[in-house]
Amino acid sequence: MLRLAAGILLATALWAAGRDTVLFDTDSGLFGDDGAALVMLLRSPAQVTVAGITVVPGNVWAAQGAEYMLHILDLLQRPQIQVYTGARTPLVHTAAMAHEAGRRWGKLEFMGAFADNPADVKPAPGAKLSLRRPHHEGAVEFLISEIERHPGEVTILAIGPMTNIALALRLRPEIETRIKRIVFMGGNVQVAGNASASAEFNFWFDPEAARIVLRSRIPQKLMFGLDICHTAVLRKAEFDRIVAVRTPITDLFREDLGNRYPGFLKHPEATGYMWDSLAAAYLLDPGFVTKSETRYLDVLTVWGRFYGSTVPLDRRSVPDATPVTVMQELNFKRLFGLYHDRLTRQD
């Protein structure tokens, strides 16, 4: 009882402190851009409070993503942050559909969890499975309860497919206008896709979920799509600056980005992208974005060559939908300075 009371008092104090309170919805791989996004926020306690981490299928299945998130929390010694496992699958899209699309219209650039065994949960390389387990409450229920308890105060950082969020909106449509804002990585407006030729991965993995969110009445929707993400290029020079500072986090960064994607240790000429880290950085320093525009957007949900593509919204069919602020250009020096600072800090 004392432990429960202390937890309630701590939560109340955090909400009252005036920080930006974030629900962190992720499809985390081993580290990559999702892990970097989490580290950046947790090392910025004066600016944001991470109220909880909800995991969605995308890069990997949700159970594996939860394990990776727990491992990062263990490294950061943040036992108070809870991880909630969300939807087991996208709303409609299946591995069979994805494989058939590849056969019909050409090889897909990236299939994420559709290429993996959903029952296969592995520890991070060189580690054991975390002794912690995800919270017994589901991610969708947690999202709903936090939004209902704190109307107008919650920022959702959505850096994976939007399945969890779409399910929350479908179960409780009234929470749409109680969300302060959603900052998300997903979609592409004027550049090619990175899953199929026309679709960005997060939207492609669950197009129906992305459509629900884009057509919603959430007051503010801020989009970090491929248009801006592909201007934030990581090269080995930036990689070397980070791994030169040895910490458990930079060692994990080195293992993942060095030996997996982009593989800087094997291919020094390789390049990678910061993707989800841009959306997290915006919560800490929005000034690194130098150009944006407002659009009404939708997602194609008819299965075919263009499934998951971002398209203009026909406002006649959805007159209540709120617009999307599409981020377009950035100051990379300012962004990387923030990224480097947070990833190399000593805990």
For each predicted feature, which ranges?
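Sec-dependent signal peptide recognition
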Residues: 1-7
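Hydrophobic h-region of N-terminal signal peptides that target proteins for export
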Residues: 7-16
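Conformational coupling and interaction surfaces
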Residues: 18-20, 38-47, 204-208, 215, ...
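Active-site histidine-anchored catalytic micro-motif
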Residues: 18-71, 76-79, 115-231, 236
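Short, glycine/acidic-enriched capping/hinge loops at junctions between secondary-structure elements
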Residues: 34-37, 64-65, 94-96, 310, ...
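Short, mixed-charge aromatic SLiMs
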Residues: 60-64, 92, 188-192, 298-315
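Short, hinge-like loop/turn segments at secondary-structure boundaries
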Residues: 69-72, 100-102, 239-241
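Surface-exposed loop and adjacent secondary-structure segments within mature catalytic domains
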Residues: 81-130
